[in-house]
Amino acid sequence: HIDHSGLIPLLYVNGFRGQVFATSATADLCTVMLKDSAHIQMFEAEWRNRKAKRADRTLKEFVPLYDIEAAINVMKQFVGCEYGSIIEIADGIKIRFIDAGHLLGSASIEVWLEENGVSKKLVFSGDIGNINKPIVKDPGYLTYADYVIMESTYGDRSHGGTPDYIKELVKVFKRTFDRGGNVVIPSFAVGRTQELLYFIRKIKENRLIDRDFDVYMDSPLAIEATNIFIKNIS
């Protein structure tokens, strides 16, 4: 989600004080992701400035796009919306969020525009997920639009069947445990980590490995995101 929402605090820094409409789950995730983004920027700017000072270079000071205060303040402008509800955001403009099945909170957006008695419907697809994913629902279907703005990063690919992720994980776990090792899995904090936790739980519940093992998630952001997943899918 951060590639879609990460610059919203910069709008706030530049004076934007309007409402930000998003699905409720996306709004929840933004409360932690935007602060994390600000923290990373502030840390990197500080590191670059220290490095430039040590090199005795008179470069322009590195400044983050926004700080944590801006990330917190802009959240007050968020309006959480539910899937399927038609919302009038201004005279002659209505929107509806449809589950895109990509990540928790992801959505395609239907926009109805009416002016001088003429009505048009515009659809922005957003990132569209695949079907039969373990946590999020399948993408919703749209039946009509006058104009479509479509995300198409993988539009030229032919997708086969869904891989058996649990089977592959079991192979890796068994091979590593048999050698006396530990399994370390780097993963995106939002989305992928939660899917991995789901797969690992299924492995343990169904006793697909003939030994018990502990699971540690070493990421404050992933822990906060997981709690938001639990809140929104339970």
Identify the residue ranges that each predicted region occupies:
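His/Asp/Glu-rich metal-coordinating catalytic cores
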Residues: 1-5, 11-195, 201-208
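Short, conserved secondary-structure transition motifs
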Residues: 29, 191-192, 215-231
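Short, surface-exposed, charge-dense and proline/glycine-enriched linear segments
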Residues: 50-58, 214-223
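Short edge beta-strand segments in beta-sheet-rich domains
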Residues: 210-212
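Ligand-binding beta-strand-loop-alpha-helix segment within the catalytic cores
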Residues: 234
